[in-house]
A protein has these predicted regions:
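Hydrophobic alpha-helical transmembrane segments of membrane proteins
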Residues: 1-98, 107-292
Length: 292
């Protein structure tokens, strides 16, 4: 077999995954839709009550969209990390591992196909669920006695609320670069996603729960360390050193945002690299340590 990367072989692997997992993918799509639909139903009922109580129409619609933004954000976040943790679902038992490891493709092609499946595939699933949610929103309007403003596209308003403006100081000047802050948020999300990719590459059975458990343990240990540093006065000394050597200006804040973004980006790349290394060392019979 050729060792050069071939998208044709990747397509064959992905087609095989789609055929074998179409039922679980359909259930996942319905689950994402249901997780957004039932809260939306409750919010529409509440919006009808807001109208009866005399709330302004625009305020009522913005409040409804703000509530939906929180729900959609939470559902999308959970869906992305859940499917990321199942990147090695195709190898969660001995028979599947034998079948997958014997596929006529390089390990890079197999790993790349799984990456596409749990990233691009999940995004497409979410988009379909959200479009179905928007259509359902229009179909439900005649059921509720709502103002005409609710006939606007819900998702457009929801995503417009997502792009908040940067904070400003007393003079009206931005405290930091809005674009740098958005970049940091997205890189942090990618890093968080890569943690579940790494967890899914290490644990094949119940990877989502095990990765969450590992993250909780690390968070608790980090909290204890942070408390000890604060109690020892390290944070106070560090704050005094920062104030002495750096002025509290937008340039300083932007520099700090840039450094943090680069650090989290490097952590993200490392997690992806380590995930691939774990996959390349996959065996038919896993070591006992990996059976946790």
């Amino acid at each position: 077999m050729e060792t050069t990367f071939s998208m044709t072989r990747v397509q064959h692997i992905m087609r095989r995954d789609l055929i074998e997992n179409w039922k679980s993918n359909l259930y996942g799509l319905l689950g994402i839709f249901a997780a957004c639909f039932f809260p939306m139903l409750g919010f529409l009922w509440s919006a009808e009550r807001w109208t009866e109580e005399g709330y302004p129409e625009v305020y009522s619609f913005e409040r409804f969209c703000g509530n939906m933004l929180g729900i959609i954000g939470m559902v999308v976040s959970v869906a992305m990390i859940y499917y990321a943790s199942h990147i090695m679902k195709c190898m969660d038992n001995k028979e599947k591992r034998i079948s997958y490891l014997l596929l006529p493709a390089t390990k890079l092609e197999k790993f790349f196909s799984r990456v596409l499946f749990v990233t691009i595939g999940t995004v497409l699933m979410i988009l379909v669920a959200l479009l179905a949610l928007e259509l359902t929103h229009y179909l439900l309007l005649p059921v509720f006695d709502l103002p005409a403003v609710y006939s606007q596209p819900m998702l457009v308003e929801v995503f417009s609320l997502r792009w908040a403006h940067a904070s400003v100081d007393a003079t009206g000047e931005p405290v930091y670069s809005w674009w740098l802050m958005q970049l940091l948020v997205w890189i942090f999300c990618l890093w968080n996603h890569s943690l579940f990719i790494l967890g899914g590459s290490f644990w094949y059975k119940h990877p989502f729960l095990k990765t969450i458990g590992a993250c909780l343990v690390v968070t608790i240990l980090g909290g204890i360390l942070f408390a000890n540093l604060a109690e020892g006065g390290f944070l106070t000394r560090f704050s005094d050193w920062m104030q002495e050597h750096y002025q509290d200006t937008p340039q300083t804040v932007n520099g700090l945002l840039t450094i943090i973004s680069v650090v989290f980006l490097l952590f993200t790349v490392f997690n992806w690299w380590l995930s691939y290394r774990l996959f390349t060392r996959s065996e038919v019979v896993k070591r006992k340590l990996w059976r946790l």
